[in-house]
Amino acid sequence: LSDMPTFSVVVPAYNVSTTIDATLASVFAPADRTAMDVVVVDDGSSDGAALRDVVATYPEVRLIAHEHNRGMCAARNTGIVASRGDVVTILDADDTLVADWPDVFLRMWSKWPVEANLCFAGCRNTAGTPTMRHPGFEGLMDLAAFISERYAGEYLPMFRGDYVRAKPYVDIGTRKSCGNISYIAWLHDTAIHISAEVLRIYDDESSNAVSRDWLKPSKAEENARCVEEELGRYAELFARHAPRKLAERWLKLAIYRRAAGRAGVWSAWARGARGAPLRSVAAALMVVLGPKATSGLVGLARAANMVKRYG
């Protein structure tokens, strides 16, 4: 596969010594693969010694350690800056690449428009279900399409290396990534190419999945901070391209503030209710019921496909 670009895989690692072996094994399993480098970033894990033991079984991997936990974006950015590849991807330490990933990647590369700095590869969960709203779609997603969530879902982000090393993730200091803030910043430069190829197996049942326990006070606090930062930076963009999505963000903020024990619950709800009156009824119910009941109701709704599971 000499015609393939060099490929960097960045794996942020925080207390994942029990899952990262499967992740790294999936990367190195194909015998015929592109020239590549793999960077694991230990983000101040409490199981750092066990992590080092696992990584040591893969001599090709470079391990970089943070002295203390700095959050997902900081870990990603440390790995990105250290990467060397023409293409850089971020692979979570509880996910895996598909068995034939070099062939899939080559097909993706051949269709990746030169004007796009980012490419979204498709994913499926461990049950084999696609995690994208439109699994067969292939093409460019511009800023308006992203803000309106036209192609919502869980994807594997891939970047042109020189671009992302110069413009890495926007880090607001949270443990979670608040990825929308970064994607909107990147979309101001170029559209994102969406590939119909599936490259990643997403373990949405993992105990480390960001969607789990999303209304625990600590996670709700971070979710609230993400939404507040997104609204502070991009409310005008949402108002112009997707006013309903702007209203829905205010409603989400009300729910997160309630779960985090924060003030400003009903003021956020009121701002969302004006633009999404029907959804505001459900949001008000969630606020009144509280996080425990809300989490159970949302889980049932997802299982019944009444609300989206990804994106």
Model-derived features with residue positions:
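Short, well-formed alpha-helical segments that are part of the catalytic scaffolds
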Residues: 16-29
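C-terminal subregions of glycosyltransferases and related glycan-biosynthesis enzymes
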Residues: 196-311
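Glycine-rich, basic loop-to-helix element that forms the pyrophosphate-binding segment
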Residues: 66-83
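Cell-envelope/extracellular polymer assembly enzymes that use nucleotide-activated donors
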Residues: 6-8, 37, 181
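Short aromatic/hydrophobic "clamp" motif used to bind/position activated sugar donors
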Residues: 88
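A conserved acidic beta->alpha catalytic loop
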Residues: 26, 42-52, 68, 92
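Conserved nucleotide-sugar donor-binding catalytic segment
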Residues: 134-213
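Conserved donor NDP-sugar-binding/catalytic core segment of glycosyltransferases
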Residues: 100-132
